[in-house]
């Protein structure tokens, strides 16, 4: 691990109070650890702007599995896509609804296109792409 460098940040008192509340609520050991996580999150989000870099993501879906041919259309998109599907997890929420997570690796633009195609299928009630990347620091 690199050496740690201390620096200071000036904040309005209300923002500092909110920071301390978040640090406490979320169980962080310190303001520094909370701030490091925020910086990492910003760097990961910005890395998604570089469409050529290989990244990872998780697509979370809730859909009605009885809907006309939805499962087959979803599988066709998965098999025909140019992203790597690492893992899927399927949960039967109730008699009609399924929760599915799809872990994906590929270029940012291809992952987003894949997620958009599946989200646009009739019968998909909820779709959220969680963007991730392994920080290089």
UniProtKB/Swiss-Prot annotation:
Needed cofactors: Ni(2+)
Highest taxon of source: Bacteria
Pfam families: NikR_C (PF08753), RHH_1 (PF01402)
Gene3D superfamilies: ACT-like. Chain A, domain 2 (3.30.70.1150), Met repressor-like (1.10.1220.10)
Family matches, as CDD domains: RHH_NikR_HicB-like (cd22231)
Molecular function as annotated in GO: DNA binding; DNA-binding transcription factor activity; nickel cation binding
Gene Ontology terms describing biological process: response to nickel cation
Ligand binding (Ni(2+)): 79, 90, 92, 98
Keywords per UniProt: DNA-binding, Metal-binding, Nickel, Transcription, Transcription regulation
Cofactor stoichiometry and binding remark: Binds 1 nickel ion per subunit.
HAMAP family from the UniProt entry: NikR
Similarity-based family: Belongs to the transcriptional regulatory CopG/NikR family.
Function: Transcriptional regulator.
Protein name in the entry: Putative nickel-responsive regulator
Species: Campylobacter concisus (strain 13826)
Lineage summary: Bacteria, Pseudomonadati, Campylobacterota, Epsilonproteobacteria, Campylobacterales
């Amino acid at each position: 691990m690199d050496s740690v460098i201390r620096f200071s940040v000036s904040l309005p008192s209300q923002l500092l109070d909110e920071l301390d509340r978040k640090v406490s609520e979320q169980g962080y050991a310190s303001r520094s650890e909370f701030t490091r996580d925020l910086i990492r999150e910003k760097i990961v989000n910005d890395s998604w702007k570089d469409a050529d870099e290989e990244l990872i993501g998780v697509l979370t879906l809730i859909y009605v599995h009885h809907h006309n041919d939805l499962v087959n259309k979803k599988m066709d998109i998965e098999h025909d896509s140019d992203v790597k599907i690492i893992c899927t997890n399927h949960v039967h929420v109730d008699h009609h609804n399924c929760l599915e997570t799809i872990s994906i690796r590929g270029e940012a633009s291809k992952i987003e296109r894949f997620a958009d195609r599946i989200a646009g299928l009739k019968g998909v009630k909820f779709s959220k792409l969680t963007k991730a990347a392994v920080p290089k620091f």
